[in-house]
């Protein structure tokens, strides 16, 4: 167990905190400071800029002034896939959800003028709290682990219960046909970024669109909801902010929820490019809910009797994650990946595709 704890802690160290801004992600800080002086209410310099270690897709920076801290997220420089790195969408959904009382940071401004720092960006509050990267929550006691998972569950149920039209997000995505559109999107991204032939991906591109469940519920979905995309209270076991809304849209809540369940079925540490794995852990001893308990908690909060078609949802989510990581593999190939850990993540595309096909077979593929 000691070696497992060491690996968990090294991952926490690897992704947590800030570093000097990477050479390829530097910009004119004086120009940014002048922009903030004009557009950020209450801003007073001087400004110091650091880069967060996490944030594989959109480079993320901590902006420090004598009186407060801010966070800046930007599109990465270089050639980008269409529809990827949509910081304008992130800004819109975070702003709207914060305004209706959801756990999202306060935003200050969106800048789509590339002349300021080279790419579009937005600025939001730095939420003071804890970002934990290890889903087994080393260093916490069983009762605290349970409360953290319960808060993760409650926060997602809250998100899916928000009236997106009243929140001003009625035009945030196309309502209906979510899975068909998502499979099409990630198929296109996979093909555009393809670096090797993976038979299972080709099979999934045919099977998934033909086997979508008929239920077409719509809500705001986060798209990448997991422990390390949340900020916990500094001392209490509860979520106070949800981060990284790049993949958010109007979609199916069960697609979103079952993605957050993938760490229970992920085969081995690290395969998921950030989702982690608790599949082989002694959850009862740790105080972490089982998959069945976590599903039951969500269903009770959202007035569902259960989740049908679970194997389809896992097949879809493994396929989707493979498509996301293939996009990172393409950026590694093109030299635009924004994290030193991106190359290692991109090597997990094939195992994810194999897992997706395993769940497709369980759902009836090939029969």
What are these regions (language model features)?
Residues 46-220, 233-237:
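ATP-binding pocket architecture of kinase catalytic cores
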Residues 304-307, 311, 323-367:
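Helical subdomain adjoining the active site within ATP-dependent kinase catalytic cores
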Residues 255-302, 316-334:
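Active-site activation/catalytic loop segments of kinase-like enzymes and analogous catalytic loops
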Residues 173-174, 305-317:
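All-alpha amphipathic helical-bundle segments outside canonical DNA-binding/catalytic cores
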Residues 231-260, 271:
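Catalytic activation segment of kinase domains across protein kinase-like and atypical kinase folds
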Residues 4-43:
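Juxta-kinase regulatory segment immediately upstream of eukaryotic protein kinase catalytic domains
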Residues 82, 142-146, 279-285, 343:
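A short acidic, glycine-rich active-site loop
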Residues 220-222, 227:
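Catalytic-loop of the protein kinase fold
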